Regions:
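C-terminal-of-GTPase-core extension/linker across diverse P-loop GTPases
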Residues: 2-9, 13, 143-265, 282-284, ...
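Short glycine-/polar-rich loops that comprise or flank the Walker A/P-loop
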Residues: 16-18, 51-53, 300-304, 327-330, ...
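Inter-motif core of Ras-like GTPase G domains
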Residues: 287-311
């Protein structure tokens, strides 16, 4: 338990209907008793039952600062497992600062970013994966990201990681016991048994690792790149999807020379839409850089939208783009369907097996079909998303990859016929690495770094 008491404004520092000042620590009740007075002047918060709310006033010595409601949560039944008070006041910036200053003057110190959640972790109320999911809940950009983050906040990752760790620890204990007491505990045929157990854990860890791309998409959105030749209608399409003029649209080929990126929400699905330079052979140095970037973004995209000007004949640039997209998740748009067609669906289908939609960006024809196609691809898992109960972040992914290597080394050790004491070394390495994910064996510097990313008052 921490010995000092912290305080912070937990709501946004802008005028609003209500502001909240949060206090947590061993002196919380003494501080609130000094600055709070009930309407009749008789009630002391410290004497009240936990999880109750009280109307009254905050005083700075003999001066009324604000009319408030005070929510009391006594240890250990609070967010931090410490005595905690939340002061609900009027949401003016000045009044919130004034109350915070009064709290600090009476014995608290300003909280660091994320320190309330850090105390919840250090006091054992949540593990490190749950703490990280708090950030994801706050930053969720759609219903799917929120659902995933809330599942993780409930401890879904913790349950799976703990189960794997317990099974590994059981084998470590068995090996050590057998080595200490070989007369009573036999290791005959044990390598074959352990091989199956470790192989199963490799499978389990690998399954958790597979959720990483899902997590990135849910947190950050689907990286969607628009490619095509100059003047195919890429910028017009971006403007339609965004709902306003973001890209310059002209008849001059090569107007877009760099990547324009906008984020849109398509019925709860977040898309990071990038309009790229038109792909063609060019002697212009600046435009060539833009073309190279367009190809690179397309290679790394979750989804590519390839816009073809259907009113002009296909050329080498079109075939180059289609070759680039053979193994990518892509939608092909035959734009300018309001004009005489020189490129048909049948012609494209002979070159590449992708969803093809005829549209007119100018007349806004086919846009709804495009949006529905993107939604269908998302829900059917064609852009790596599926309805997993949780997703992992980069830190957790790294530890899982290291764990996987340790387990694979154990398998190799068994196959090489090494002595049994070598097995427990690799298993212990895997056990400790999994502990880093949930915070049971993690360095203080890493904990500090994780919680420094939180907002103030959380």
């Amino acid at each position: 338990m921490n010995s000092d008491t912290i305080a912070a404004i937990a709501t946004a520092m802008s005028p609003s209907g209500i502001g909240i000042i949060r206090i947590s620590g061993e002196d919380t009740l003494d501080i609130i008793d000094r600055i709070y007075r009930s309407k009749d002047g008789k009630k002391k918060i410290s004497k009240c039952k936990s999880h109750t709310i009280h109307y009254g006033y905050i005083y700075d010595e003999d001066e009324v600062v604000d009319e408030v409601m005070v929510l009391l949560m006594k240890a250990p039944n609070s967010y931090t497992r410490e005595d905690t008070v939340e002061i609900d006041c009027h949401g003016g910036v000045y009044v919130m600062k004034r109350i915070l200053e009064t709290v600090i003057k009476n014995g608290a110190r300003p909280a660091e970013p994320g320190e309330f959640t850090k105390r919840a972790f250090l006091n054992g109320r949540i593990d490190l994966t749950q703490a990280e999911s708090v950030i994801d809940v706050i930053n969720a950009k759609n219903d799917f990201a929120l659902k995933s983050s809330l599942n993780q906040l409930k401890g879904s990752v913790l349950v799976d990681i703990k189960k794997i760790r317990e099974e590994i620890l059981h084998e470590i204990a068995f090996i050590e016991s057998a080595l200490d007491d070989p007369e009573h505990i036999s290791l005959d045929n044990y390598p074959e048994k352990l091989l199956k157990i470790v192989d199963n854990q490799v499978y389990n860890v690998d399954n958790i690792l597979k959720t990483f791309d899902n997590g990135r998409i849910l947190r950050e959105g689907i990286n969607t790149v628009i490619v095509g030749k100059p003047n195919a209608g890429k910028s017009s399409l971006l403007n339609i999807l965004v709902g306003q003029e973001k890209a310059i649209v002209t008849e001059i080929a090569g107007t877009t020379r760099d990547v324009l990126e906008e984020q849109i929400n398509l019925n709860g699905i977040t898309l990071n839409v990038m309009d790229t330079a038109g792909i063609r052979d060019t002697s212009d140095v600046v435009e060539k850089i833009g073309v190279d970037r367009a190809k690179k973004y397309a290679e790394n995209a979750d989804l590519v939208i390839y816009v073809i000007d259907a009113s002009t004949d296909l050329d080498d640039s079109d075939y180059e783009i289609m070759d680039l997209l053979q193994d990518k998740k892509a939608i092909i748009l035959l734009n300018k369907s309001d004009l005489e067609a020189k490129v048909t669906v049948d012609m494209i289908q002979k070159q590449i097996d992708k969803k093809i939609i005829s549209i007119s960006a100018k007349e806004r024809i086919g846009i709804r079909e495009l949006e529905n196609t993107i939604k269908d691809m998302f829900f059917q898992g064609e852009v790596t998303f599926n309805d997993e109960v949780y997703t992992i972040n980069v830190r957790q992914k790294t530890s899982l990859q290291i764990t996987l290597k340790h387990l694979q080394q154990v398998i190799q050790t068994i196959k090489d016929g090494m002595p049994e004491d070598f097995y427990s070394i690799g298993l212990m390495d895997a056990y400790e690495e999994l502990g880093k994910i949930i915070g049971e064996s993690v360095e203080d510097d890493l904990v500090d770094e994780i919680f420094s990313k939180f907002c103030m008052g959380k």
